[in-house]
């Protein structure tokens, strides 16, 4: 199962703040590898082209839908989401699908 998220950061953030926040989100989310059962791969892209309308993308692969469900409430994921992502993002788009 793939779990793809696209975020836009809040408009009031400076370019320097956005760069630091994107790096922190990348470190936090990619640091979940090996901590969450069923999480096979996790990559965060923070270097979109100027033509993009999102600031960063999470690309994860899970063993199955049950693993994705467990990830959503896992304390390590919740800590990263609440501490490093949600305070700084204004939009979130999610697509989950079978591969």
Show the residue positions of the predicted features:
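Conserved RNP beta-strands of RNA recognition motif
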Residues: 5, 58-60
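Hydrophobic alpha-helical membrane-association signature
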Residues: 21-25
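An amphipathic, aromatic/His-enriched active-site/gating alpha helix that lines ligand/cofactor pockets
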Residues: 26-27, 31-35, 39, 61-95
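Short, conserved charged micro-motifs
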Residues: 13-20, 68-70
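Short, glycine- and small/hydrophobic-rich beta-strand elements in well-ordered beta-sheets
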Residues: 30-57
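Short coil/turn motifs at secondary-structure junctions
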Residues: 10-12, 49, 63-67
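Residues that line or immediately flank small-molecule/substrate-binding pockets and catalytic motifs
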Residues: 8, 46, 96
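Active-site-flanking beta-strand signature of metal-NTP-handling nucleotidyl enzymes
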Residues: 1-9
